[in-house]
Amino acid sequence: MRMKVIGLWVMVLGLLVGQHTVQATELGASYYFPGISATFAPGIAPHAGVVGVEQMLFQSGKADAAVQGGRVQTNIKADVFFNVVGVTNTVAKSSLGGNTFQWGVFVPVGSVAINSTVSTNFGSHSLSDSTTSLGDSTLLGSLYWKKGDIHYKVTESVFVPTGAYTMHNLSNVGRNYWGFDTTFAMTYLDMKSGVEVSLAPGIMFNTKNEATDYQSGTEFHVEFALNKHYFKDHYAIGLQGYYYRQISADSGSGARLGSFNGQAFGIGPAILWTPPAGKGRVSVVAKWLFDLNHENRLHGNYGQLIVAYKF
């Protein structure tokens, strides 16, 4: 019975994909969203079938400086919200060695509001801009397997530049380049105590933004989760976090701040709820991460609210 419950709970956990968040790289920003890879039991394969998911991602932060639209911006304050709608399909025994395979498609609508200062030959000027539009879509594929008491998952996410982008705008929902993220997740879950430990390292590669001649560097990220599951009560709680580091320099004529390598560390609480009224078909995840350490990036807080329904 407990394994059945776990199978229903994890139906949302393979659905969490990164969207446009503000980090290092161009405008100190990246496709990687902290806390998106390791939530609750990320390595455990979900049941076969189709799942619809809605994710709401929040970020509010500040940075001393970054480059946007070919100009150096200082004293930056940004507020970001994304509403991501997606669908996944899970095949229990795929042709890939008989292991569970999942694919998914996600399309976001985002709102970005930025305030900053720009220096010109005529002095410094305060700027502000906001926009709401379609964001960059995500395609993903995940392969699950188990060895002993450890569950594993490898995921490849492709970020497609379908979002709105204008070079000289201060705020853009789209990023105008492709991103490729490979993540490997591991989960240990003790079914008697309900204690879970998960780890999810990953690496992100970016193509060049041809409009600004800005090549964002390669990004390494690792996420961790220590969770406690209460199977009979239909919920779980956890302490979760992330470490992020840019491992290669930004480049191109648009990289006016040089290498601009960024790094960050954050941690915070999370809760998973599978309401009994949903008969195991509905799962809700809420999460809030506090940015504790940062360099060359917007620093602030990250929020997630995810609702999924298995058809």
Where would I find each of the regions flagged by the language model?
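Transmembrane beta-barrel strands of outer-membrane/channel proteins
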Residues: 52-60, 103-109, 154-160, 199-205, ...
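Short loop/turn motifs that connect adjacent beta-strands in outer-membrane beta-barrel proteins
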Residues: 25-27, 41-49, 91-101, 116, ...
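Extracellular loop and loop/strand-boundary signature of outer-membrane beta-barrel proteins
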Residues: 39, 69-75, 122-128, 166-172, ...
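Outer membrane beta-barrel transmembrane domains
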Residues: 28, 32, 210-311
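Detector for outer-membrane/organellar transmembrane beta-barrel domains
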Residues: 151-157, 164-251, 273
